[in-house]
């Protein structure tokens, strides 16, 4: 169970002018957040050169043509050779699935990929290569410096097909028009 002020299961929305081009217009689903740090997956930066069917073949799964295709995303700048499947909580791999909340889970083992390729597994999923990580207090400091906004996660944003509109859709959940945002911030 997460602490009351935990961002687990929430979305981070990158603010214009945050200063890190790797996160420009990013929407990050927060999988873990505690005093020790935070881990999230960018859900709106696809890796169009990578195809799920080719990955399944490369991994040597004997499933024929995959029964299902999921999109592959750039999850963040840390360990970008490692895969993480963010998915609906209707799937669980014993001992290897992190239940983020009642709606979302994350699995980082090969079995979930094989299940998806066979047409089984979670009803909604995306594969992220790499993750976004923060040390103790680092994310909180970035939020205080107006680098990020936070909002509740919605499946239609997290698992939605149109990656180009996820950033503006997340902002709209807060009642913010993306065209009205400034790249600079201040305090009165």
Model-inferred region functions:
Residues 1-128, 132-188:
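A short aromatic-anchored loop/beta-hairpin motif
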